[in-house]
């Protein structure tokens, strides 16, 4: 699955909340995780940070991982062979992960947990409650 080639990765974080193209790409990618016959699933992008990092963030957040785990997972890319070949630097990476974290944390209701806000986002982009439960079941069992 190619999430999208027309999307500029550096603005991925801001646009997943506003642009239908991004929402549709995420929905299609996430639907793959609803069917246990699709496992194991390997997903990647050019550096493993932008599209891959966004998808991994959503999946891990949906499964209840805490903020520290989400940040560590995302920042691992920085230490890969190609992790900083784009010259983004640690400050840019922190900005990107902060955009994801706070974008989801405050998505629907700031009193809701991160996981609840991610679930609300997934429902808003067209996944069903059954889809969400299937993803969790497939990843947690």
Description of each model-found segment:
Residues 1-42, 54-141:
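Cys-dependent protein tyrosine phosphatase-like superfamily
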Residues 47, 51-52:
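Ser/Thr-glycine-rich phosphate-binding loops at phosphate-binding pockets of nucleotides
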């Amino acid at each position: 699955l190619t999430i999208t080639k027309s999307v500029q990765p550096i603005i991925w974080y801001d646009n997943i909340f506003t642009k239908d193209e991004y929402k549709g790409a995420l929905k299609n990618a996430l639907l793959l995780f609803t069917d246990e016959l699709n496992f194991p699933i390997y997903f990647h992008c050019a550096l493993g940070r932008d599209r891959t990092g966004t998808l991994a963030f959503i999946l891990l957040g949906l499964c209840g991982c805490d903020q520290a785990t989400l940040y560590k997972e995302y920042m691992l890319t920085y230490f890969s062979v190609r992790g900083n070949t784009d010259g983004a630097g640690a400050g840019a990476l922190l900005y990107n992960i902060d955009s994801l974290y706070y974008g989801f944390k405050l998505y629907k209701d700031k009193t809701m947990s991160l996981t609840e806000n991610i679930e609300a986002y997934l429902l808003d982009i067209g996944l069903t409650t059954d889809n969400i439960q299937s993803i969790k079941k497939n990843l947690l069992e």
